[in-house]
Amino acid sequence: MKWLLAALLAAFFVYLMYDTFAEKPILVRRKRLCDYTASGSVYEDIPTAIKRGIRLLEVHVYSDERDQPVVSMVPQNSGWDFTDDNVSFEQVCVDIVNDAFPSKDPFILSIVSHTDKSVTINKVAEHLLTTLRRHMTYEKNIQTAPLDSFANKLILISGGNIHGTALEPLLNLSWSDAGVRRLSYQQALHPRDPSELARFTKDHIVIVAPQPELKTLTANPNTPLAFGCQWNLFARDPPGFVLKSSRA
């Protein structure tokens, strides 16, 4: 009788172990944000871009005749401070909240301002807070934070003439700071110091932007990856976050 009881207890223990390990898969946490590359989109229909899976979007913001922020859908010549082919920044926020979430990944929004009107940039901040507040995180300098800590979150990056506006404190990353660089494709393709750029991308973020005026949209988009540049706005890679070492 004792051996039967022992056998039953052993069987019950095996069942518990199976239930613990087989039915509940072990979660593997991903590495740091700066350890992943992401292909992105710019000057593209935003709902279409998001629905095909991109997690990196850059918008070029201008001020309309009412000082409202609008996003250009076509590249403008350098120095222009207006755009005719545009959508409202408010609509961009609505598209993001409707189509980009929920997700296990963050959504990166890069904002390039082409206006010096603080009232317009303050409106950008207002629309973000009104529409996307529950997905926002106010952490700063997040390059080395775990990617999984930003699941279902919006990561904001910008720079330049947003200093002193309501948008500035909402940013997680800024290419005006030392830990982030925004390079043109030509700058990433022909860095002045390739070794220094490769070292920089070990713990920092580089975002690579296309140069339509130099017709680089059709160039090999993956070349900057050789130096570790993470965020490529016109790469042809599959959407999502890809571990850099897996590209070797």
Please give the residue ranges for each predicted region.
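Long, acidic (Asp/Glu-rich), low-complexity accessory segments flanking structured domains
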Residues: 1-56, 63-248
